[in-house]
């Protein structure tokens, strides 16, 4: 099978694509890949580092307001379609999949026009502009949230989940806890604000640190590398309790996620896919700075099923943070109910499900 993949801009579009590629390599070692992205996106460094052939096209996203820039964007889109057709003809894929971000627009559109089987994968509960546009032309739209399905033609929608979920399975949670200094018998909560950290969460944590020192559970706090020194400076003035461990970054996140009892985090699509696959209860603090407020809608999908609590950033204080953690971790029945609810939402074999959809299209 020859697979052409496109997606970029943010890790949320790139990492699911890489997880899918790794799964296909396991199931079909003869498979060949080409990844098309932009020169300036994260994908231009991440994808080649993963050993996957990479080509770039020049493209930009549409402004949401009427603008002269949109005229340039249309011109770039048309040029991107022509460049994509050239790469597609040269690579001769059996199937093309777009994982979101404006770069996959011309690539997947070009493939559809050339009669090649096409899929888009939508990670969020609120679809991006590019995937909504492409849904008119592709064969299938793979989604991760039920809420996303209503935005697409129903005959094309398949619920596959996020391939990243598959990569957190079969991890050693005890090893994960030991690696960061958590004790095995105690309950623990992991608090983090995404790969780069989040200042409002850092501020609430610093305010709460003295009260955390009185708790029976342990706290693992991840600041994000850029915030670490500032947080540690503030913590030094208040004192760092023995049951609070602070790290700038965690390199073995799947192991650590498996080991802890509760997670406090943003509500990005990849994070929620991993948490539900593992059956982890969570307190979700959606980022209010994302397009279409999609993180709050992602969180709502999990909260409504009883698998998480939602704490809006505007309501985030030391008191509300501790309150929500205590209500879950200190109540065995609540913790158990939320574990079950999260597990029912999870799709741990998401990468395999997406590969099956691809296989069916190729064999048609």
Swiss-Prot record:
GO terms for molecular function: UDP-N-acetyl-D-glucosamine:N-acetylmuramoyl-L-alanyl-D-glutamyl-meso-2,6-diaminopimelyl-D-alanyl-D-alanine-diphosphoundecaprenol 4-beta-N-acetylglucosaminlytransferase activity; undecaprenyldiphospho-muramoylpentapeptide beta-N-acetylglucosaminyltransferase activity. UDP-N-acetyl-alpha-D-glucosamine binds at residues 10-12, 124, 195, 250, 295. It is found in: Cell membrane. It holds the Pfam family Glyco_tran_28_C. It catalyses: di-trans,octa-cis-undecaprenyl diphospho-N-acetyl-alpha-D-muramoyl-L-alanyl-D-glutamyl-meso-2,6-diaminopimeloyl-D-alanyl-D-alanine + UDP-N-acetyl-alpha-D-glucosamine = di-trans,octa-cis-undecaprenyl diphospho-[N-acetyl-alpha-D-glucosaminyl-(1->4)]-N-acetyl-alpha-D-muramoyl-L-alanyl-D-glutamyl-meso-2,6-diaminopimeloyl-D-alanyl-D-alanine + UDP + H(+). It is a peripheral membrane protein. Its EC number is 2.4.1.227. One of its GO terms (biological process) is regulation of cell shape. Its main location: membrane. It comes from the Bacteria. Cell wall formation. Catalyzes the transfer of a GlcNAc subunit on undecaprenyl-pyrophosphoryl-MurNAc-pentapeptide (lipid intermediate I) to form undecaprenyl-pyrophosphoryl-MurNAc-(pentapeptide)GlcNAc (lipid intermediate II). This is UDP-N-acetylglucosamine--N-acetylmuramyl-(pentapeptide) pyrophosphoryl-undecaprenol N-acetylglucosamine transferase 1. It comes from Bacillus anthracis. The gene is murG1.
């Amino acid at each position: 099978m020859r697979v052409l993949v496109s997606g970029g801009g943010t890790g949320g579009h790139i990492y699911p694509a890489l997880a899918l590629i790794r799964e296909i390599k396991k199931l079909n070692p003869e498979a060949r890949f080409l990844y098309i992205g932009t020169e300036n996106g994260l994908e231009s460094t991440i994808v080649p580092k993963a050993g996957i052939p990479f080509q770039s096209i020049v493209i930009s996203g549409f402004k949401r307001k009427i603008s002269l820039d949109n005229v340039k964007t249309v011109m770039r889109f048309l040029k991107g379609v022509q460049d994509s057709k050239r790469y597609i003809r040269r690579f001769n894929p059996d199937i093309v999949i777009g994982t979101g971000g404006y770069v996959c627009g011309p690539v997947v559109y070009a493939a559809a026009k050339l009669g090649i089987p096409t899929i888009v994968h939508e990670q969020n509960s609120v679809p991006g502009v590019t995937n909504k546009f492409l849904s008119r032309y592709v064969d299938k739209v793979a989604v991760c949230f039920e809420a996303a399905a209503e935005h697409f033609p129903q005959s094309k929608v398949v619920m596959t989940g996020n391939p990243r979920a598959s990569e957190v399975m079969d991890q050693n949670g005890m090893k994960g806890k030991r690696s960061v200094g958590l004790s095995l018998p105690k309950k623990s909560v992991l608090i983090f604000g995404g790969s780069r950290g989040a200042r409002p969460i850092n501020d609430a944590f610093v305010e709460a640190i003295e009260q955390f020192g009185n708790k029976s559970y342990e706290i693992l706090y991840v600041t994000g590398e850029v915030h670490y020194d500032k947080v540690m400076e503030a913590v030094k003035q208040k004192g760092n309790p023995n049951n609070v461990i602070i790290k700038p970054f965690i390199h073995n996140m799947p192991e650590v996620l498996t080991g802890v009892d509760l997670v406090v985090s943003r509500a990005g699509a990849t994070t929620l896919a991993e948490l539900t696959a593992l059956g982890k209860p969570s307190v979700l603090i959606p980022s209010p700075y994302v397009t279409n407020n999609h993180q709050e809608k992602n969180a709502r999908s999990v909260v409504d099923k009883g698998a998480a609590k939602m704490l809006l950033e505007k309501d985030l204080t030391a008191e509300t943070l501790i309150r929500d953690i205590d209500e879950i971790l200190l109540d065995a029945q609540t913790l158990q109910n939320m574990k079950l609810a999260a597990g029912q939402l999870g799709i741990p074999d998401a990468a395999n499900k997406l590969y099956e959809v691809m296989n069916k299209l190729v064999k048609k």
